[in-house]
Amino acid sequence: MHQPGSHQIQPIDSLTPFLGGKWWIRARVADKSDIRTWNKPTSQGKLFSFTLIDESAAIRATVFNDAVDTFEPLVVNGQVYYFSGGQVKNANRRFSNVNNDYELTFDRASEVILARQDSSAAALPMQRYNFVPIELLKQREVGSLVDVLGVVLKVDEISSITQKSTGRELIKRNVKIGDMSAAVEVTFWNDEAKAWNYPVGTVVALRQLKVGSFDGVTLSSTYQTKIDVNPADLPDVKKLATWYVSTGGANVVSLSSQGLGAGGGGGGEGNRGRKYLDEIQSEGIGRGAKPEYVDVRCVPIYFKQDAQWYDACPTCNKKVTEEGAQGDRFRCEKCDATVVPTQRYLVSIQVTDNVSQVWLTLFNEAGVEFFGMEASELKRRAQEDPLYIAKLAQARMNRPVVMRLRVKEETNANAMTGEESDRLRMSVVRISEFMPVAGTTEETRRRLAQNLRSECDDILRCIEAYV
């Protein structure tokens, strides 16, 4: 089959549904997906998709049914081809974040020809990204697809969950990705979760991640997700690497503890900003239907040294019960299995901001940030040195920190009487930094004076009531 002449070639950015006559494009293939099938009462079929890139733009293309058998063996990632006979239609943003208002579908009448891999073909871009700064993810609609460029800040171990709708076990791995604006948690599934081997400090370009809103802004891999490690042709890669080397990724706010606005566009609902501890009560924070998040600058003054962790099932993280008399056998009721447990943090800690004092709960991730090690490592050191936790407490107490708190009012029933009562629960979702001890600020002095005047007014009112 003859290759079309250069005068017949259209740039991708000129394709519209109203383009008449036969057209050709020359483009590089990227992001080729596996073949996917569907079988519904009303229809059945198969498809695969890929992105086409030339000097002008990129466009998403999908091949359906019989054409799959023709196109799929021919189309290879990275190669340059001529395409013709596709239908140009409005893009479906649910399935693509390619920066184009249109997309292509190919059928049996479409044509594909391998182009000569000459210098002009080599000049075509290998990839086109549509990166979103992490801080701006909170403005994106839940369910939309995004590209993100960032540094790996934290890699969790593999875990598994059971999909409620199908009963299937799914493998997952959470990875924290950050740039100079913010950080976000990305969940990778199944093969991608197992294959992840990029250490902390690696710069990664992630394509086609889905925006979620589980306990804040989160991202999740899809069947279209692609990972490009340390892509040298992107100008911001060196800048990100330098930023990480100089800062270690510290002091970036994690969006994965901040709620999305309505429809994903509000960008701030659920996040109440910096507060004093007494303002959490006085402003009714956390009293609504959804949890709210606040940042507080405070000083840890005490934590219960007799219980920092619990023995957990390595699969579901639920608490396990001891079975063997020697303390070497544990059972997970949820998984209905005997397991070798791991340890996870569950710590009660008291903090003050020089105005108020409250008790907070540290779950596992916040516990790792606070103690500087995994719970299993803390247990090992405590067993080797009975005074280790006391020494650690001395090192960690009375040092100012900035904590992000999850605040939610919960209703509990008294086990003896059955009476219900409301209680405001506050847990730590992030400890952003340990800061050097500083003198009392002017703002803190103002707040202390304000509270003192308020207490004096209360005393005077009590006196007047009895005079």
Curated annotation (Swiss-Prot):
A zinc finger (C4-type) spans 313-335. The N-terminus is blocked. Keywords: DNA replication, DNA-binding, Metal-binding, Nucleus, Zinc, Zinc-finger. InterPro entries: Euk_RPA1_DBD_C (IPR047192), NA-bd_OB-fold (IPR012340), NA-bd_OB_tRNA (IPR004365), Rep_factor-A_C (IPR013955), REPA_OB_2 (IPR031657), Rfa1 (IPR004591). Residues 23-105 bind DNA. GO terms for cellular component: DNA replication factor A complex; nucleus. GO terms for molecular function: single-stranded DNA binding; zinc ion binding. It is found in: Nucleus. One of its GO terms (biological process) is DNA recombination. As part of the heterotrimeric replication protein A complex (RPA/RP-A), binds and stabilizes single-stranded DNA intermediates, that form during DNA replication or upon DNA stress. It prevents their reannealing and in parallel, recruits and activates different proteins and complexes involved in DNA metabolism. Thereby, it plays an essential role both in DNA replication and the cellular response to DNA damage. Component of the heterotrimeric canonical replication protein A complex (RPA). NCBIfam families: rpa1 (TIGR00617). Belongs to the replication factor A protein 1 family. This is Replication factor A 51 kDa subunit. The gene is RPA1.
